[in-house]
């Protein structure tokens, strides 16, 4: 099983969500964690943003978005951030473009919702999905009233990241972007993927 390094995403010194390491110096998160309507210049221009990634409370690492303009143009709630330093000495490949249907499979989500005091792990079941999203039914004992801060968290099956959380439907259900969709929509040249495996 692969170890997945998750951390908090900070924008303008405020925690906006969760992100996780997908390469030695690249983090992925939900685009809305780093871009709000106020960030878009009057003429519609979008500039790459400085973002901080925080694994331990007192040691944030600075980075800059790699594909914010492209993500906004293509309408996908996902962005990659290149960090100024490597956080791993060994190659990392956690994003998994799987070929099978996950409906009915159990999954895990780990991240930093504001309602919790630190990192938590939720378990659930993939309820249904389409090419561009899937729905997770959170186990009753793991349900929260508000999942704010969980956006950008990895969704894993057997340690493989198959998606990232982008929003909450209600206290019982979360919506996620499939890795396969992210790879099809965004240029991800510097990001390693495991392609078309059966989990």
Where are these regions (language model features)?
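Catalytic nucleophile loop of clan PA
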Residues: 20, 143-166
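Conserved small/polar residues in nucleotide/adenosyl-binding loops
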Residues: 197-199
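A short, polar/charged loop-to-alpha-helix boundary motif
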Residues: 171-182
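Short solvent-exposed strand/turn elements
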Residues: 84-89, 139-146
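Conserved PDZ fold ligand-binding element
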Residues: 27-28, 162
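Serine endopeptidase catalytic core focused on the charge-relay Asp
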Residues: 2-16, 20-24, 31-39, 43-134, ...
């Amino acid at each position: 099983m692969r170890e997945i390094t998750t951390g908090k995403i900070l924008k303008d010194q405020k925690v906006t969500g969760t992100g996780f390491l997908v390469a030695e110096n690249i983090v992925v998160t939900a685009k809305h964690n780093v871009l709000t309507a106020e960030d878009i210049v009057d003429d519609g221009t979008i500039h790459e943003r400085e973002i901080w990634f925080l694994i331990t409370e007192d040691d944030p690492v600075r980075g800059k978005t790699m594909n914010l303009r492209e993500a906004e143009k293509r309408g996908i709630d996902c962005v990659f951030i290149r960090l100024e330093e490597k956080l791993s000495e060994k190659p990392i490949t956690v994003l998994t473009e799987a070929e099978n249907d996950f409906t009915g499979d159990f999954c895990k989500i780990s991240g930093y919702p504001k309602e919790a005091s630190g990192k938590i792990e939720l378990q659930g079941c993939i309820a249904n999905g389409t090419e561009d999203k899937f729905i997770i039914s959170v186990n009753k004992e793991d349900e929260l009233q508000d999942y704010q801060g969980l956006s950008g968290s990895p969704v894993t099956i057997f340690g493989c990241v198959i998606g990232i959380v982008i929003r909450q439907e209600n206290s019982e259900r979360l919506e996620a972007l499939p890795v396969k969709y992210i790879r099809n929509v965004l240029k991800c040249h510097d990001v390693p993927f495991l392609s078309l495996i059966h989990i």
